[in-house]
Amino acid sequence: HFFWGLEDIIAVFTDLWGSSGVTKNVAGLFPNDADGNAWGHPELGLPKPLSEMGYNLVHPDHYQPLSDDFSAQINAYKEAGCEIVTGVMIPPDFGTFWSQAAQQGFNPKVVTIGKALLFPSFVNSLGDRGNGLTSEIWWTPDHPFSSSLTGTKAKELGNDYVSSTGRKWNQGLGFQHALFEVTADVIKRCSDLDDVSAVMASISSTNLSTMVGQVNWSNGPVKNVSKTPLVSGQWQKGNDG
């Protein structure tokens, strides 16, 4: 596994909020699913570290995925004076919440949502209300990385994808490429591909500079995890929409 962790989400989200100058009342939106239960866990999720940093997390209850009514949550956020909204949502749930927030006069100054805002197609579907939303950023063509297989730089990979597909690049592109890099590197170094132990030894000894950064399982937080960089970013309307 090479990716970032929830601790990185907390770090980049709070860094973004700290630079915004808004009050520390945060509306929390956590679904009753694996991601929502992890993010909303009182000890291991967002509540404890946010409280330690002086944030007041307003979280009435976990909502059911594909809910069609967020009125109870919106009323609680309005009463608490929440100026920040955060959580981890699938696109349909955020679309429903964001539409109802507008209808009910809830206008937070900062909206930082995990998962739902990763892809441009969904953000574009929100129209003008997609402008200014913020989220975690796994990878972009502006990241200072290149392919260990081809030498292609992140900028070139993004441009090639756009020109060949006619679609905008997305954050998963770099990781999809990196999977092939790691696979090729493991195969190249493995002493016997028919021996499970040899394959595992090759994987665990990986130390490779990839399209998403360094993949090295010898220095991760646990043996099967290699951390990759995470930043936050804001969606802004460009000349191409």
Where does each model-flagged region fall?
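An alpha-beta-alpha
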Residues: 1-65, 84
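Segments of small-molecule ligand-sensing domains
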Residues: 160-173, 184-240
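Extracytoplasmic "Venus flytrap"
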Residues: 29-41, 92, 144-147, 168-175
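Extracellular/periplasmic periplasmic-binding protein-like sensory domains
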Residues: 101-177, 189
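Loop/turn elements at helix/coil->beta-strand transitions in domains of secreted/extracellular proteins
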Residues: 21-25, 52-58, 80-84, 104-110, ...
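Periplasmic-binding protein-like
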Residues: 25-30, 81-91, 97, 108-113, ...
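Hydrophobic alpha-helical segments within soluble ligand-binding/sensing domains
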Residues: 1-24, 69-71, 94, 118-121, ...
